[in-house]
Amino acid sequence: MSYLFEILPSLLSGASMTLQVFALVLIFSIPLGVLIAFALQVHWKPLHHLINIYIWIMRGTPLLLQLIFIYYVLPSIGIRLDRLPAAIIAFVLNYAAYFAEIFRGGIDTIPKGQYEAAKVLKFSPFATVRYIILPQVTKIVLPSVFNEVMSLVKDTSLVYALGISDLILASRTAANRDASLVPMFLAGAIYLILIGI
C-alpha cells in the first residue's frame, strides 16, 4: 500500500498533463469542427474539395502518424514546434475533422423548410444558424460528440510518443524503475476514472 502512495504523485502529475492536453484539444477542436461543418454548407466547389481532402487525410491516417509528421517531419521544411504545441496541433486537426463530420451529419438532418422560414422571418444567415439551426444540431449530435470526447481521453496517451510527461510516460517510468506492473494498472484505473467523469 505504501508503494501506491509512493508512485501516486508522479502518476497524478502525468494525469494533470493528460487533462491539460484533453482540455486544450477540446476547446479548439469542437469550434473548428463546427466551422468546418458549416463551411461545407457553402456552395463553392473548391472549398468543398479542400475540406473533403482534409477530412479524408485526417480520418484516414492514424493519429500517431500525424503526431510524428508534425513533430519530426515539419522541421525538415523549417517549421519547428515544441512537443506540447505539436501534439495539440495534431490532435486539434485530427479531432476537428471528426467533429466536422458529426456536425455535418446533424446539419443535414435539419429540414430545408426551417431555413426558408427563417428567411421569411427576415433572420440574417448568422441569426438563422445561431438561434434555429445550431440548437437543434447540438441536441442531435450530443451522443456522438460524447463518444468522441471519450475517445479523446484515451487517445491522449499517444503524446507519450513525443516524450511528453503524461500519465502513460509516468506509469511506464515507474514500472521500469521498480520492475512492477502496479503503475500500469494504476494508470489504467485513472483512465477509467477520467472516462467515467
Question: Where are the regions a protein language model picked out?
Answer:
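Transmembrane alpha-helices and adjacent helix-loop boundaries
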Residues: 1-197
